[in-house]
Amino acid sequence: MAAVGPPQQQVRMAHQQVWAALEVALRVPCLYIIDAIFNSYPDSSQSRFCIVLQIFLRLFGVFASSIVLILSQRSLFKFYTYSSAFLLAATSVLVNYYASLHIDFYGAYNTSAFGIELLPRKGPSLWMALIVLQLTFGIGYVTLLQIHSIYSQLIILDLLVPVIGLITELPLHIRETLLFTSSLILTLNTVFVLAVKLKWFYYSTRYVYLLVRHMYRIYGLQLLMEDTWKRIRFPDILRVFWLTRVTAQATVLMYILRMANETDSFFISWDDFWDLICNLIISGCDSTLTVLGMSAVISSVAHYLGLGILAFIGSTEEDDRRLGFVAPVLFFILALQTGLSGLRPEERLIRLSRNMCLLLTAVLHFIHGMTDPVLMSLSASHVSSFRRHFPVLFVSACLFILPVLLSYVLWHHYALNTWLFAVTAFCVELCLKVIVSLTVYTLFMIDGYYNVLWEKLDDYVYYVRSTGSIIEFIFGVVMFGNGAYTMMFESGSKIRAFMMCLHAYFNIYLQAKNGWKTFMNRRTAVKKINSLPEIKGSRLQEINDVCAICYHEFTTSARITPCNHYFHALCLRKWLYIQDTCPMCHQKVYIEDDIKDNSNVSNNNGFIPPNETPEEAVREAAAESDRELNEDDSTDCDDDVQRERNGVIQHTGAAAEEFNDDTD
């Protein structure tokens, strides 16, 4: 089979996109029906039977709309094909009824609200229009139901019979009889088609039920819902639903404003425009479905914002592409937590603006999480290109300036309350995070500017990051207290209590636990490093070697492990954060009281101390190699001692490359 060329692939992709867009458009009416049912309430003045019947019909409408919403693409197209055919049949019957019984053919003139003429004045012209209309309905009906036999012609003729009776000016009772007979024949044919398709509907329903049950048993409810969510493109459906709803409302409101102002101008004043925007925003979150639709729109905006920032700063991390998921989830949780859709219109607008401020600060925090790794990688890799550093520094500056401006504007227009306190705390925390990142970035850039090893760099970076983590922990505790006060004295809810529990676990407990663990690991590593003997002065010059971890020379001092390997104290301490073994021979790093300084064993470079013959050094090195083999199977050696040393150094170099990526 020949390979598909690029033009054919483009045509195929365009074809698939068109079908996907059509599928999304066909699922949107189901959301309109569900939203209309949820926004309507039964009339309490009616009898109990009528109320129960209305509730049953609403539940049935929600259930049927939900089933149509999750249909497969093929089943969805078939459903709309049959529905369109039945709609054409009903429209044809209504047109025949209205034309036969309610139109004066000798004075027909119908206008719409805009003054546009719909039907011609003269009778023959109206007859021809009715014939063309019924032919269109009949051809569409038989085409959609795929009726190809002689019955298709009879059905079209059946639709034209009432028009023929109208043209021949038959008496009224005969026209009524013809209309009733035509409608009955069309109804019987529709019922017959439904009966024929009922078998297909039964087997399709049974197949879908068995498939869903099978997937539920194998994969569980969560994966089943995720698969359905992706298959029907539910976020796209929500976006189209919300945007079309807002567009329709905007069109109606614009028409009302034009009629109220009695002007033909397309433009409106700024006051009317602001009122229009406020009304659209208020009506755009008046139910749970509309809040979901707004969340889907926010998801799309946040997704492309995140992609733009990633492209601007030059990041390729896949985990940083989750802004389009985090932002809508947070917005929806805030809406549920504050009861946004159930508030009065004025309160809803105020609450929505406050939620958007909180969402903005959260998005800025997420963007900082995107820029911080890029900032650290640029500073640690010693890249001097201005084009690489400027975008990240520019975004960091914006992340510092925007929270300051937001806090200034809010404090200038609002009095202090729990919401303003929370937004201000988030802004101050973000500014401190940016300061910490820029400080660490500056330290690494200073270290890269000098060629000498800066042994205190790790300590300074740890102090800066620890200070930032402690301040962040304090802010987490303060925000927990602010949320507790809000829940007890302002607006308590189960969702707020649940979110406070999550905040206490992730932002307080886990952060404190991880910080304490890091502190203890560092403290233990420092104790172990301080317990190791140190080489300085002339003896350090006699070694004339480099550290096996960082490959830098020993300039000031070196630490000797119990297995008589030597490293920089800083490098060995970083290694001990990861594992408690020697990087060279993988023995435990510990100090015993009876261990003394022994330089009669080979070190990193096979250094032979003075007053010792090479033959003795080789014999002792071979004996030491045998002992290492007996103690640890992870080292490889041959009869040649030098080959063993080379293998160990290569192994250590690979570990050191992985270790050097850690900046803690």
From Swiss-Prot:
Q: Which Gene3D superfamilies match?
A: Zinc/RING finger domain, C3HC4 (zinc finger) (3.30.40.10)
Q: Which residues carry this modification: N-acetylalanine?
A: 2
Keyword Metal-binding appears in the UniProt entry = yes
Q: Which Pfam families match?
A: TRC8_N (PF13705), zf-RING_2 (PF13639)
EC class? transferase
User: Where is this chain compositionally biased, Basic and acidic residues type?
Assistant: 616-628
- Residues carrying Phosphoserine: 634
Q: What is its EC number?
A: 2.3.2.27
Which terms in the GO cellular component ontology are assigned?
A: Derlin-1 retrotranslocation complex; endomembrane system; endoplasmic reticulum; endoplasmic reticulum membrane; endoplasmic reticulum quality control compartment; membrane
Region annotation Disordered: where it falls in the sequence: 601-664
Is the Zinc keyword given for this protein?
yes
Disease tied to this entry: Renal cell carcinoma: Renal cell carcinoma is a heterogeneous group of sporadic or hereditary carcinoma derived from cells of the proximal renal tubular epithelium. It is subclassified into clear cell renal carcinoma (non-papillary carcinoma), papillary renal cell carcinoma, chromophobe renal cell carcinoma, collecting duct carcinoma with medullary carcinoma of the kidney, and unclassified renal cell carcinoma. Clear cell renal cell carcinoma is the most common subtype.
What's the domain remark here? Answer: The RING-type zinc finger domain mediates ubiquitin ligase activity.
Q: What does this protein do?
A: E3-ubiquitin ligase; acts as a negative regulator of cell proliferation through mechanisms involving G2/M arrest and cell death. Required for MHC class I ubiquitination in cells expressing the cytomegalovirus protein US2 before dislocation from the endoplasmic reticulum (ER). Affects SREBP processing by hindering the SREBP-SCAP complex translocation from the ER to the Golgi, thereby reducing SREBF2 target gene expression. Involved in the sterol-accelerated degradation of HMGCR. This is achieved through binding of RNF139 to INSIG1 and/or INSIG2 at the ER membrane.
Protein name, UniProt field: E3 ubiquitin-protein ligase RNF139
Organism per entry: Homo sapiens (Human)
